[in-house]
Amino acid sequence: MEKPKTISEIINLWKTDKKHYIKRSSYSAYALLIENHIKPSFGELIDIEEPEVQEFVLQKLANGLSQKTIKDILIVLKMILRFATKNKWLASKQFDIQFPTEREKHFVEVLSRANQKKVMNYVQEHFTFRNLGIFVCLSGGMRIGEICALSWEDIDIDNGVIHIRKTLQRIYTIEDDHRKTELILDTPKTKNSIREIPMSRDLIKLLKPIRKIMNPNFFVLTNDTKPTEPRTYRTYYKSLMQHLDLPNLKFHSLRHSFATRCIESKCDYKTVSVLLGHANISTTLNLYVHPNLEQKKKCIDQMFKSLK
């Protein structure tokens, strides 16, 4: 009779199998969750039951880990257990894990209209390639990895669009218990992230004189063959916000600000979702569509008018 495999042994076999057909960035993210959370809690076991997973979740919450991160960990754990079931190392598992109700609603942080105008005016008046990137993000809602990966060949002045087809990120790699980081240029994670973003008239006006003299293979943020990595660009963005005496919002707030301005301008939700490269429209609705009291009253009034 074959000796039962530990969860650690199953994880190693799963990683070897998974490595062949998922993106390196995804593999790296999975490996980090496994090494930091799954192996320390379950690695020495030969089976996992629901009460153990529920206790794991409650402990992680008590230690300050977000529900989103914990749910990401559970997704990886379930993939590993399905792999074990498929290979007949474990019986099939169906867990019903409970999370406490989140009392506070989390709203995205955005620049006010006045502060957004202040940033856009400044970066136009003080042109640098890094400032150009800030303007592009506020004009098109790009993620930081997408703007860092943007090259001049992606900017199509004739058709007035920016092609989003690459992302730049630094990933953690764990091999034989040795951890290191690596900067990788890759395609975006989902097919929806590969998209075209129309340029505003102001952006075309800014880019048209310089696009034709730029090397198409150079990165926009550096105008060189070597890119700026996201961590470095975040640091620059933070210093720019301090210089302008603006709130200390995360870089991602530029993307949130773009989306919020689109919604405020009555753009239809499906178009906003496509511009942002969201996997589905529900992501856009959950993040950006929060009717205020005045809008709710208007909705009720319109409903009763239709009954008369």
Which sequence ranges carry the predicted segments?
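DNA/chromatin major-groove-contacting recognition/catalytic segments
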Residues: 119-122, 174-178, 286, 290-308
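Active-site/catalytic core of tyrosine-dependent DNA strand-transfer enzymes
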Residues: 198-247
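Conserved tyrosine-mediated DNA breakage-rejoining catalytic core shared by Y-recombinases
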Residues: 150-209
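Proline-centered turn/helix-capping motifs that create local helix->coil transitions or kinks
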Residues: 84-94, 168-174, 209-215
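Basic, Lys/Arg- and aromatic-enriched nucleic-acid-binding interface segment
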Residues: 71, 90-92, 96-144, 148-150, ...
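N-terminal core-binding DNA-recognition domain of tyrosine site-specific recombinases/integrases
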Residues: 3, 15-83, 89, 105, ...
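Short functional hotspots where side chains directly engage DNA or cofactors
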Residues: 159-164, 220, 250, 261, ...
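C-terminal catalytic core of tyrosine-transesterase DNA break-rejoin enzymes
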Residues: 86, 135, 139-146, 239-243, ...
